[in-house]
Amino acid sequence: MSLLVIGATSTLGRQIVKKALIQGYEVKCLVRNSKKAAFLKAWGAILVYGDLMVPETLPQCFVGASVIIDVSTVKVKDLNNDYTVDIYCKRAVLEAAIQAKVKKFVSFSMFNSSQYLDVPSTKIKSDFDRALIKSGINYLIFTPLGFFQDLTSQYAAPILSSQPVFILEQSESVQISYIDARDAANIVLAATSLAFLKNIDFPLIGNRSWNNVSIISLCQLYAGQASPVVTVPLLLVYFIRRILGFFAFTRQFYFYLTLVENLSRSSYLSFNHENENKFLKIYQKKLFSLEKYFQYYFTHKLGNLKKQINNF
């Protein structure tokens, strides 16, 4: 199985590349900037130049690839053309895959993306999902809720530095099943390698759901210190969002706040574990826990800090 990974420098993308190389797969990475992706080449991946904004560069990248793993993210930049440009890029990738007659197309979407269609990046994901399903290519659509790695900058790092942690009002009611990106990569590769697993969507979730209050408590426990927690009123977010919506240069942040506000009103961002298929249940038992992840993170960081103090 030869893989072409798009978005290989992302949190999940780099883990997929690393795991695939360890497992002996031939891995090509579509990149626009070879310098930023140099570490992928050092691992053993083949870098091929391609620009999603220039569809003519894509077909040559797909030659010889049996599976496409698209982990690329949508970036809204242009107020007037954000949707048309970005969906054009995503569909150009799909067209190149169809022409190359790939055996399977692996895509990543947002859980319940149809509920947040007022956010362009989410609408693009939803529309691309429908296009992929109608394309006739064998596909897998994964819907991750969040990765452990993203929580370090949001919670762990500020707490370790005694900096304030910001949370939204009422957001403690939101329960999210985060997963380690390394475990997610293993699941993606295992599912991709099985020919009978096709034309379905998969949740990429951990074995426990967390709210921000419990995550903060966990970080404070392992850090051995508390940090101030600042609660941002939803009403303030609403007014800021309304103001930003009037200006083109702040429209991207406006869309982000729209999504944040919508998510804060969701009561539970998880899947019913009882309804998961047998394949996912096998991996659920092997997943790395958030407790162990943070324990390792803080032990490593605090250990390095002690060494620096001793060497001072």
UniProtKB/Swiss-Prot annotation:
Its main location: plastid. The keyword Chloroplast applies. It comes from Cyanidium caldarium. Keywords: Chloroplast, Oxidoreductase, Photosynthesis, Photosystem II, Plastid. It comes from the Eukaryota. Involved in assembly of photosystem II. It is found in: Plastid, Chloroplast. GO terms for molecular function: oxidoreductase activity. The gene is ycf39. Its EC number is 1.-.-.-. It holds the Pfam family NAD_binding_10. One of its GO terms (biological process) is photosynthesis. Belongs to the NmrA-type oxidoreductase family. Ycf39 subfamily. One of its GO terms (cellular component) is chloroplast. This is Photosystem II assembly factor Ycf39. It is an enzyme of class 1 (oxidoreductase). InterPro entries: HCF244-like, NAD(P)-bd_dom, NAD(P)-bd_dom_sf.
